[in-house]
């Protein structure tokens, strides 16, 4: 069964980016090679600071959407509670 992930990366400028991936390692490499999201392209390098795993893409995308609505402080709390 495939696994699905949501992740948060910390960008060079200190901002946080939340995304979805089936393979986090490959996705982080893409972000750092400028092949990821437009947002991270100009904020490289990025560093993985948080991840969650799900059994279905639907669950992962729902959680990604939820986290994207969080304030920066709420995201930092989530990261620190790991």
From Swiss-Prot:
Gene3D superfamilies: GIY-YIG endonuclease. Belongs to the UPF0213 family. Residues 2-77 form the GIY-YIG domain. InterPro entries: GIY-YIG_endonuc, GIY-YIG_endonuc_sf, UPF0213_domain. This is UPF0213 protein SSP2268. PANTHER family: UPF0213 PROTEIN YHBQ (PTHR34477:SF1). Pfam families: GIY-YIG (PF01541). Transmembrane segments: none annotated. It comes from the Bacteria. SUPFAM superfamilies: GIY-YIG endonuclease (SSF82771). It comes from Staphylococcus saprophyticus subsp. saprophyticus (strain ATCC 15305 / DSM 20229 / NCIMB 8711 / NCTC 7292 / S-41).
């Amino acid at each position: 069964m495939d696994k699905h992930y949501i992740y948060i990366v910390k960008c060079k400028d200190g901002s946080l980016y939340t995304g979805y991936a089936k393979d986090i390692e490959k996705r982080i490499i893409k972000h750092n090679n400028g092949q990821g999201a437009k947002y991270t392209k100009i904020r490289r390098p990025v560093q993985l600071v948080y991840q969650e795993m799900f059994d279905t893409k639907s669950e992962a995308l729902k959680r990604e959407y939820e986290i994207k609505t969080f304030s920066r402080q709420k995201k930092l709390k989530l990261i620190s509670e790991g």
